[in-house]
Amino acid sequence: MKKAAIITIGSELLEGLILNKNAQFLCQELKNLGYRVVKVSTVGDDLISISEEVKTLLLKVDLLILTGGLGPTQDDLTRDAVAKVLNRSLKLNEELLSKIKEKIKKYHSEIPQNIERQALVIDGAEVLDNPVGSAPGQLLTVDGKIVILLPGPPRELIPMFNALKDRLRTPDALYQVVLKYYSIPEAVLEDLLKDILYSQNIVEVATMADHVEGVRLRLTTHMKNKEYLDEMVKKILDKTGEHLYGVNDEKMEEVVVRLLKDRKKTLAVAESCTGGMLSSLVVNVPGASEVFAGGVVAYSNDLKKHILGVREDTLRKHGAVSKECVQEMTEGLKKLTGADICVSISGIAGPSGGTPEKPVGTVFIDIFEHEHITMRYNFTGDRNTIRTRSAMMALENLRKYLKGREKV
């Protein structure tokens, strides 16, 4: 198996000012491409330190990836360090400089004087296009080894690395499928599938669970066993397909928006304890404007009454966190927006406000098109966890409703 190493560059990483998300992403991706990552190091913005690390690791690995230090400032030293170790010159690429300037002009009225540094290319390097930012990457081949320079911001690095994956894939590459579920507990899912998952030794099985993505069943094997894994997935879906919301990188909100488009339905949401979180998830999806009418954050009882038409009598008898309240919230929202489907959420996120009858974590979610589908939940966790789980469960219920489930 080929070996790889990663050098993440930036004093801000050493000082703990930002998380090293690039290392996590690259380690996962390189494993899937058939590399064994033998070292991940973090180096500050220092020419000697970067150079020494590059020199040392080039003796040990087949692939070396450096992230960060490709900006225009004097402390962006990655290009200089790699050129120094390889004893190659840095040359200004005028064509590249013009492209960088054109990109900057779209967002800024003035072009920084030091921008030329981003157009310095190591002799013999292939320039890698950055579709998001202004700092291009570079790729070099050195005695059969590959050296790749990528920018530090993950939103720039990820698409640039993804564009290289086909070129970097090795004979030891892995094939992986991730199946995502939300409303089924991890233990229940595993029990349903144990005869399929654990009666073989060809596919590596891992389950992970959190309050954002739910339960993820990760299935991994070597590329030569792709057909075996695909057949295994079919058997799994025969048993659990109704619970599945996504595969691999699919997000719940993306699935819901796609279903709304397919069914030509519009959506509006009324939120209390989630404070706009559900609306935010929906509008994060490109093209959501085709189906999303809008949202109302009615945190106080006054707004619930005056904007959504919740009756004073309902609030007095049942409280804001109740089946009756969320149903009146969706009814009022439908009158207000005219959306086909309305969803409302009201709950107690804590840490205070709970009672014996309605402890912290009590949440009501209502879906209303022609009739009400109302669910009560008792979530656990801190305030942010309860709010996140509430928004995600609203999406899960909506997904099931749009798929035509009798129950959500």
UniProtKB/Swiss-Prot annotation:
InterPro entries: CinA, CinA-like_C, CinA_C, CinA_KH, Competence-induced_CinA, MoaB/Mog-like_dom_sf, MoaB/Mog_dom. Gene3D superfamilies: 3.30.70.2860, CinA-like, MoaB/Mog-like domain. It holds the Pfam family CinA. It comes from the Bacteria. NCBIfam families: cinA_nterm (TIGR00200), molyb_syn (TIGR00177), PncC_domain (TIGR00199), PRK00549.1 (NF001813). Belongs to the CinA family. This is CinA-like protein.
